[in-house]
Swiss-Prot record:
Cross-link Isoglutamyl lysine isopeptide (Lys-Gln) (interchain with Q-Cter in protein Pup) mapped to chain: K47
Chief location bin: cytoplasm
Alphabetical keyword list: Activator, Cytoplasm, DNA-binding, Isopeptide bond, Transcription, Transcription regulation, Ubl conjugation
Name of the protein in its database record: Probable cold shock protein A
Gene Ontology CC entries for this record: cytoplasm
Pfam family, one: CSD
InterPro entries found in the cross-reference section: Cold_shock_CspA (IPR012156), Cold_shock_domain (IPR050181), CSD (IPR011129), CSD_CS (IPR019844), CSP_DNA-bd (IPR002059), NA-bd_OB-fold (IPR012340)
Location in the cell: Cytoplasm
Presence of keyword Ribosomal protein: no
Positions of the CSD domain: 1-66
Record-linked SMART domains: CSP
Domain of life: Bacteria
GO MF terms held by the record: DNA binding
Amino acid sequence: MPQGTVKWFNAEKGFGFIAPEDGSADVFVHYTEIQGSGFRTLEENQKVEFEVGQSPKGPQATGVRTI
């Protein structure tokens, strides 16, 4: 499972970007793909693991979990 670092995440709008560790292009992340209960958000520079899926607008992180 790929890992990366949260580049930024806007909790009000519910989305942000993850910088993958392999140096590939940043990946869009939507709050609905963050695993867990309650208010789902991410913090800048937080380490995460995720899968990459395709959305109509391009690559999107799915199954995002903090590590």
